[in-house]
Amino acid sequence: MRFLRSVILSSLALPATLAAQTIPTLEYAARRDSLAARIDSGVVVAFGGRTPVGPDRFMQLPAFRYLTGFLEPDAAFVMVVRPGARRATLFTSERDPRRALYDGFPPDSAEVARRTGIDARSVGALPAHLDSLAGTGLPFYTLRDFATADAAETDSLTRGAAFMRRFADGHPGLTVRDAHPILDSLRTRKSPAEQAMLRRAIDLTVGGLREVMRAMKPGMWEYQAEAMLQSAFRRNGGDGAAFVSIIGSGPNSTQYHYNANDRRIGKGDVIVMDVGAGYGGYAADVTRTLPASGRFSADQRAVYQIVRDAQAAAAKVARPGTTFESWRDAAREEVARGVARLGLTEGVDATFDPPWADQCIDNPVACTQSFLYMAHGLGHGIGLEVHDRPHPWYGAGTFQPGDVFTIEPGIYVSRKLLEILPDTPKNRAMIAKVRPAVERYRDIGIRIEDDYLITGTGAEWLSRAPREIGEVEAEMARRP
């Protein structure tokens, strides 16, 4: 009853939902203009998401949404580009009276054109339209509908890919190119309108996290925290959770992508909450780590502060022109120094024999002992996808104004950490030295993740939920 009461009281205390924000129709048109300018001449073909099998909620594919703003299923987009001119058409599903009993009537062509500013036709006219364009000699640029592919089958094809393969087979000599690299470059920098959408998604996430901080106590179930967050996101005008929430307590805090959320939280646990609200299709991604009792133990505080220092180091160097590599190094060096200080490694630069030794050729850090405690990337872009552009966690590149991204260092001391290591003389010597520290800090997983915007001078912190040790403990003391 106290848990239910806390949810009700917190909902009464929340401000009224702000007026809905949207991406203007003119911005979608500008995006299409930018894509057209990059290809100069050709035919762009993109397929939207399909109607879900069963009662699942439909979510439009990000690339399709980015270009059209159209949110109905079973649509296709064709844009013919010639020097100095372009013509775009949406092909939308036909009205089926019986299907409408289940899913409602889709908008007709006139309504689609009014909503999107794009000429609209029935999807049944798509094959003939493409046939007529195949004879123009223009190259075809395709946008693959990744989200409908079966990732477990390397030879699987999405609906769009299968259609285009058949189409190309029927038109020998047709040039087909991948438009995704071009679109990716356009999606990397976020416009002011996109930044506003992301700020709203982030604010919703921060509000939900504050609710959970105030309600958290030993004996709660992980799924109760997840339910509180989902409720907060929806009550305040969000799309809901932008991805499956991670609520990992105790040993689950050391599993990066744990999401069963079915464990009862113990008194001495830390809880990693990696969550994000969606708003208008845009995804936030924020992580906070809480002490179940409301106060971090001395060992938990020690690990937490290393992670926080690593995040601060990365945020400090993030500005226009900063290389992704130097940004990653700033955080990694803090983590390496910290875990060495705790006795979890033999030294800052100490190495080991990993089971993934082949990866060390291109990424030498993967062979350092500190990598055992943070094997994931430092951050990623956010936007229409929770892992959006830019991709600063690997490869080369520099930050530029308009980049919106996460910084999410972590340290995870799994009780099974030493069991995954190959039995080599080097590893045996390391294990003998670090085992006492691993036993001391085991089941402590700490991750702190925040969202940032690159401005003209640096990185603006967007996700302003309590994160310093004292701030987290003070927020948790504000019981509902």
List PLM regions with ranges.
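Bacterial N-terminal signal peptides
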Residues: 6-17
